[in-house]
From Swiss-Prot:
Coiled coil spans: none
Catalytic activity: 2 L-dopa + O2 = 2 L-dopaquinone + 2 H2O; L-tyrosine + O2 = L-dopaquinone + H2O
Positions glycosylated per UniProt: N86, N111, N161, N230
Membrane topology recorded in Swiss-Prot or TrEMBL: Single-pass type I membrane protein
Main location: membrane
A Pfam family of this chain: Tyrosinase
Similarity field: Belongs to the tyrosinase family.
Keywords: Copper, Glycoprotein, Melanin biosynthesis, Membrane, Metal-binding, Monooxygenase, Oxidoreductase, Signal, Transmembrane
Gene Ontology MF terms: metal ion binding; tyrosinase activity
Gene from which this protein is expressed: TYR
Protein name listed in UniProt: Tyrosinase
Organism per entry: Coturnix japonica (Japanese quail)
EC number per UniProt: 1.14.18.1
Enzyme class: oxidoreductase
GO biological process: melanin biosynthetic process; pigmentation; response to blue light
Length: 273
C-alpha cells in the first residue's frame, strides 16, 4: 500500500521503495490522487491480472498525534501519502513495490516464493577486493540516475494541489539521502516559519524499524543497478570504538589536513558533490 518515503511506522508494514514513482509524478495522477501503475509483466494496474495486487484506497491510522506535533493539515507527511494519493497498490503475498513488481525482502524468483538468505559482514573483515567493490558500487549509485523515482521540489500547495507538478530527477545514492532528509526535516508552516520539535524518522518508537527498512530499500536499489543479487551493506561494529576508526581514507574518508569541514583529498569520496 505505501510506496514512497517511510514517514510513519506504517510504512514498515507495507514497504516502499523510494520517494515518488516516476510514473505517478504527473498532473493526471496527482489530480486523481491515484498511483496504481501497471506491472510490466501483464500490463494491468498493480499486476492484478497475475494476482500480484490490487488498486485500493489507503487505510489511515486513526491513532491521535502526540503532543509534540500540535498541528493538523499543515504537513504533506501527515497520514502519508494521502496528501498526494489516496489510492495505491496493495500487494498480495510476497510481492511489494509501487506496482507490486518487486519481491519482499528475503524472497526472490518469478513468483517471489524462493527464500534467499544474504549475510551482512563486518566491513573490517572484507578483503581488499570486496571493500573496493563496495566503494565502487556506492560510486556507481552516486552517478547513475534513478530509473523509477523522482523527488518533490515543492509542497503539495506549491504544486497547486497537483495541477503544477514539481519534481526532479536524482541519482540512486542521493535518492536515499533525500528520503532520510524528507522524513526527518522540520515542518514547514508557510513563509519562513518552521516547527522544529518534530522528527518523523528518529524521535519515535519507529526509529529502529524505520532505519532497518530504509537500509533494506537502499540495499535493494544497489542490487538492481549493479545486477549483483548477493550484495549486502557491510556493517561497522562501533560498540567498543573510542573514536571513528572507519574515518580513514581506506574506508569512509579521513579529515582534510587543513580544513576540518572537508574530507581528505585522498579519500575516495572527496570529489563527491
Amino acid at each position: 500500500m505505501l510506496l514512497f518515503t517511510m514517514g510513519l511506522l506504517l510504512a514498515i508494514l507495507q514497504p516502499s521503495t523510494g520517494q515518488f514513482p516516476r510514473v505517478c509524478a504527473n498532473t493526471q495522477s496527482l489530480l486523481r490522487k491515484e498511483c496504481c501503475p501497471p506491472w510490466e509483466g501483464d500490463g494491468s494496474p498493480c499486476g492484478e491480472r497475475s494476482n500480484r495486487g490490487t488498486c485500493q484506497r489507503i487505510l489511515l491510522s486513526q491513532a491521535p498525534l502526540g503532543p509534540q506535533f500540535p498541528f493538523s493539515g499543515v504537513d504533506d507527511r501527515e497520514d502519508w501519502p494521502s496528501v498526494f494519493y489516496n489510492r495505491t497498490c496493495r500487494c498480495r503475498g510476497n510481492f511489494m513495490g509501487f506496482n507490486c513488481g518487486e519481491c519482499k525482502f528475503g524472497f526472490s524468483g518469478q513468483n517471489c516464493t524462493e527464500r534467499r538468505l544474504r549475510t551482512r559482514r563486518n566491513i573490517f573483515q572484507l578483503t581488499i577486493r570486496e571493500k573496493d567493490k563496495f566503494l565502487a558500487y556506492l560510486n556507481l549509485a552516486k552517478n547513475i540516475p534513478s530509473k523509477d523515482y523522482v523527488i518533490a521540489t515543492g509542497t503539495y500547495a506549491q504544486m497547486n494541489n497537483g495541477s503544477n507538478p514539481m519534481f526532479r530527477n536524482i541519482n540512486v545514492y542521493d535518492l536515499f539521502v533525500w528520503m532520510h532528509y524528507y522524513a526527518s526535516r522540520d515542518t514547514l508552516l508557510g513563509g519562513s516559519n518552521v516547527w522544529r520539535d518534530i522528527d518523523f524518522a528518529h524521535e519515535a518508537p519507529g526509529f529502529l524499524p524505520w532505519h532497518r527498512a530504509f537500509l533494506l530499500l537502499w540495499e535493494r536499489e544497489i542490487q538492481k543497478i549493479t545486477g549483483d543479487e548477493n550484495f549486502t551493506i557491510p556493517y561497522w561494529d562501533w560498540r567498543d570504538a573510542e573514536d571513528c576508526v572507519i574515518c580513514t581514507d581506506e574506508y569512509m574518508g579521513g579529515q582534510h589536513p587543513t580544513n576540518p569541514n572537508l574530507l581528505s583529498p585522498a579519500s575516495f569520496f572527496s570529489s563527491w558533490q
